[in-house]
């Protein structure tokens, strides 16, 4: 029986990141709405409780509160951002509007040598004060500590940036330790979960396989399952896991929607029919997809259309299988989060994912999502534990809508052909270039990264087609052709990301090759936007 951490979600877009950090400490956790009943909290029997952030304010008429049972259990509690504010209000403190809102990077001073922050610092001031580099996102602030609490941290704009009641094991921070921008955030959460809560670190993917297989068998019984196979990491691992559970009851449906990467169809069929010996049905539906996308420019509309057409194709294939009752998908946590689909339904929608946004209520198949509660690196760990080859497991993620969300505006076959060739060149250059000692000296990578390919050093890389033309010169002639943008990011969780600082020589080779080898493109740019404020995909 795993020790469990209960994460109460107040509607933050990054609540799942809290879960990711807890799981990185190999401790099992679950996310549930903040308004669960006292009985639920008691029956859950958590080793500790974490209160998430929120876009809401403690001043709103319908204030979000933690159940009273949280304070009656006698277990450690960690409040984050809004979670700190509701802890303060519920336990007798005071919260007020802040004249100096904080959104972004801040330097925070630790006070009092509490168990949570003791010995954790990024640098020390001349006066000897330990300082932390943190990420803030708040408009309200705690103005008065609740009884029994002591000051734990502060910033110039937020005098009470952290508070602690060590006797009861209550800790709260105004910053977000779950995001990668908080340098020591992972260490802080591990400290809370492992040392303060005393949870056992026994949550590992090799153990998860047995539980997941048993759950799939219980759900499916003797019914048949169809799965949309894209060749990406998520659908591949989902297919392997389901195949492990029910064997030939699974039929993989590979749909060529005309928006795949270069030579992807052949690679997918060779991989799954040849290596996994799974049943694969190949459906060429490119005319169907591209036809419905004609004239459509809105990103959400494109995603919904692609999702809808996937469902229609799957339904058509399901009718050919007498026992097909289930549609399996490789949906993972970030898909659900970016669709505003947390269990509370309070998160603000950023974009809909094809796996969750395009399914009509009248879908004739039941939905099987065995990876829904896992993050990307957990999915990769699961794939390795299932025996999948590294080239499959560590391939960069590819969106379900394919190149449809990497072509800005209207999708045309001409645009897709140009983009897939440009994308292939960029990926080829990343795979063929290794990091050097000079790259490390320039701060582009760490010393331990020397010798690794830049493909392995980036988490996701791709080209984007821009439907605008620019003037160029080739030979003695004037050109007027399209523009493509290269995008490469580094991230541990895909919830936040930094743009990859690639060597100029690599970018130069990729640009020169694209312009010379892809007729129709005469300008290449590089995207240096982080997430936030930008998303990883352009649409």
Swiss-Prot record:
The keyword Zinc does not apply. Coiled coil: none annotated. Homodimer. GO terms for cellular component: cytosol. The active site is at 81 (nucleophile), 176, 178. ATP binds at residues 230-236. It is an enzyme of class 6 (ligase). InterPro entries: Class_I_gatase-like, GATASE, GMP_synth_C, GMP_synth_GATase, GMP_synthase, GMPS_ATP_PPase_dom, NAD/GMP_synthase, Rossmann-like_a/b/a_fold. Keywords: ATP-binding, Glutamine amidotransferase, GMP biosynthesis, Ligase, Nucleotide-binding, Purine biosynthesis. Gene3D superfamilies: 3.30.300.10, 3.40.50.880, HUPs (3.40.50.620). The lineage of its organism: Bacteria, Pseudomonadati, Pseudomonadota, Betaproteobacteria, Burkholderiales. It comes from Burkholderia ambifaria (strain ATCC BAA-244 / DSM 16087 / CCUG 44356 / LMG 19182 / AMMD). It catalyses: XMP + L-glutamine + ATP + H2O = GMP + L-glutamate + AMP + diphosphate + 2 H(+). Catalyzes the synthesis of GMP from XMP. GO terms for molecular function: ATP binding; GMP synthase activity. The keyword Ligase applies. Residues 203-395 form the GMPS ATP-PPase domain. Its EC number is 6.3.5.2. Pathway: Purine metabolism; GMP biosynthesis; GMP from XMP (L-Gln route): step 1/1. Residues 4-202 form the Glutamine amidotransferase type-1 domain. This is GMP synthase [glutamine-hydrolyzing].
């Amino acid at each position: 029986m795993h020790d469990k951490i209960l994460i109460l979600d107040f509607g933050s877009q990054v609540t799942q990141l809290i879960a990711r950090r807890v799981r990185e400490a190999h401790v099992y956790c679950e996310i549930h709405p903040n308004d669960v009943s006292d009985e639920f909290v008691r029956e859950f029997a958590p080793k500790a409780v974490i209160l998430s952030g929120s876009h809401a304010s403690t001043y709103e008429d319908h204030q979000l509160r933690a159940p009273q049972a949280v304070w009656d259990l006698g277990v450690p509690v960690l409040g984050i951002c809004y979670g700190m504010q509701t802890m303060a209000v519920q336990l007798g403190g005071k919260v007020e509007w802040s004249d100096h809102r904080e959104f972004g990077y801040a330097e925070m001073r630790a006070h009092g040598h509490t168990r949570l922050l003791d010995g954790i610092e990024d640098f020390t001031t001349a006066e000897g004060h330990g300082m932390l580099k943190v990420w803030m996102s708040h408009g309200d602030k705690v103005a008065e500590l609740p009884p029994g609490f002591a000051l734990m941290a502060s910033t110039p704009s937020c005098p009470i940036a952290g508070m602690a009641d060590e006797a009861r094991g209550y800790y709260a921070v105004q910053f977000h330790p779950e995001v990668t921008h908080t340098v020591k955030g992972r260490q802080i959460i591990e400290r809370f979960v492992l040392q303060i809560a005393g949870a056992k670190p026994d949550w590992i993917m090799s153990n998860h396989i047995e539980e997941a297989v048993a759950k799939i068998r219980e759900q499916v019984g003797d019914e048949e399952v169809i799965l949309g196979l894209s060749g990406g990491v998520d659908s591949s691992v989902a297919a392997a896991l389901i195949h492990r559970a029910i064997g030939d009851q699974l039929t993989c449906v590979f749909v060529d929607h005309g928006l795949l990467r270069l030579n992807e169809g052949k690679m997918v069929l060779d991989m799954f029919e040849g290596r996994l010996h799974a049943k694969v049905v190949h459906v060429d539906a490119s005319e169907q997809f591209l036809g419905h996308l004609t004239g459509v420019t809105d990103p959400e509309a494109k995603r919904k259309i692609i999702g809808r057409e996937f469902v229609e194709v799957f339904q058509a294939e399901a009718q050919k299988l007498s026992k097909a009752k289930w549609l399996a998908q490789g949906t993972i946590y970030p898909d659900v989060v970016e669709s505003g689909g947390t269990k509370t339904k309070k998160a603000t929608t950023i974009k809909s994912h094809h796996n969750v946004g395009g399914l009509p209520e009248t879908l004739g198949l039941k939905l099987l999502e065995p990876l829904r509660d896992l993050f990307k690196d957990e999915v990769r760990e699961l794939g390795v534990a299932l025996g999948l080859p590294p080239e499959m497991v560590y391939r960069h993620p590819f969106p379900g809508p394919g190149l449809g969300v990497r072509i800005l505006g209207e999708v045309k076959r001409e645009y897709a052909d140009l983009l897939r060739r440009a994308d292939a060149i960029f990926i080829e250059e990343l795979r063929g270039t290794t990091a050097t000692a000079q790259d490390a000296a320039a701060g582009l990578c760490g010393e331990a990264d020397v010798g690794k390919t830049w493909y392995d050093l980036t988490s996701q890389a791709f080209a984007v087609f821009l439907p605008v033309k620019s003037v160029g010169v080739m030979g003695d002639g004037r050109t007027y052709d399209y523009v493509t943008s290269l995008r490469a990011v580094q991230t541990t969780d895909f919830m936040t990301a930094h743009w990859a600082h690639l060597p100029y020589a690599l970018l130069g080779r990729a640009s020169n090759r694209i312009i010379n080898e892809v007729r129709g493109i005469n300008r290449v740019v590089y995207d240096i936007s982080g997430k936030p404020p930008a998303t990883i995909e352009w649409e």
